């Protein structure tokens, strides 16, 4: 059995040990005969993949106490991975959500690292730089590249630290490893969303056995 998190850009597949990143087309061609339990935020794909008999949409099973109606199913799954903590998914956008005793307390959304860089590029070609993944946050920058990198990372870190309040910080997503390096005792885990999905399935299985 595989678990899949189908995003807007990529198809993320988990075999219980390893996370595999594929294009939507590649995933359908290669895994259409496999038994897959998935969540999907790319609505344009739903009709096509719902016709694959061995694939099962479990989005409705991502039940998170306190979640608001339009909250993304991938965010719900991430927050179901642990009963307490602050959860960050650093992808195209950066989502930050707080969980206390299994209940959703609220969260916020920031642009992703690439979106920040694109915003700078749109202002001036002089600001078209790559991110310095090792920029120091303990001293003021002396170059344009470091100034932009500092502005991006420090603004994200300041907001997350404000709401952390001693909670364990869990980080996932394509830019998660980079972002986690700027926090003390952050837990980077590429499989957090899948662990939340599995927890939701386990809860349903337990409830079914009680009936």
PLM feature segments, named:
Residues 1-17, 82-103, 120:
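Gly/Thr-rich phosphate-binding beta-strand-loop-beta motif of the actin/hexokinase/Hsp70
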Residues 2-27, 40-42, 174, 180:
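N-terminal beta1-alpha1 ligand-phosphate binding loop
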Residues 5, 76, 187-211:
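Glycine-rich phosphate-binding/hydrolytic loop that grips phosphoryl groups
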Residues 13-16, 29-32, 45-52, 97, ...:
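Short loop/helix-cap segments at secondary-structure boundaries that form the rim of catalytic
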Residues 33-44, 166-175:
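Short glycine-rich phosphate-binding loop at a beta-alpha junction
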Residues 47-82:
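Glycine/small-residue-rich loop that forms an oxyanion/phosphate-binding "nest" at active or ligand-binding sites
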Residues 106-125, 190-197:
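Gly/Ser/Thr-rich active-site loops/lids in small-molecule metabolic enzymes
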Residues 113-166:
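Active-site rim beta-loop-alpha module in soluble metabolic enzymes
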């Amino acid at each position: 059995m595989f678990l899949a998190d189908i995003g807007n850009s990529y198809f993320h597949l988990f075999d219980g040990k390893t996370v595999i990143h594929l294009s939507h087309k590649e995933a359908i061609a290669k895994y259409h005969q496999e038994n897959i339990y998935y969540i999907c935020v790319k609505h344009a794909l739903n009709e096509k993949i719902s016709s694959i008999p061995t694939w099962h949409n479990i989005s409705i099973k991502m039940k998170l106490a306190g979640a608001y109606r339009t909250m993304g199913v991938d965010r719900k799954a991430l927050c179901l991975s642990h009963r307490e903590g602050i959860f960050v998914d650093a992808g195209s956008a950066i989502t930050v959500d707080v969980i206390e005793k299994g209940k959703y307390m609220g969260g916020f959304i920031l642009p992703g690292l690439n979106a920040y860089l694109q915003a700078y590029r749109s202002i001036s070609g002089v600001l078209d730089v790559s991110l310095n993944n090792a920029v120091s946050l303990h001293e003021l920058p002396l170059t344009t590249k470091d100034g932009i990198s500092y502005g991006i990372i420090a603004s994200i870190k300041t907001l997350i630290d404000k709401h952390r309040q001693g909670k364990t910080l869990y980080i996932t997503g394509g830019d998660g490893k980079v972002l986690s390096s700027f926090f003390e005792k952050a837990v980077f885990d590429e499989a957090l969303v899948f662990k939340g999905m599995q927890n939701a399935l386990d809860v349903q299985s337990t409830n079914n056995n009680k009936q």
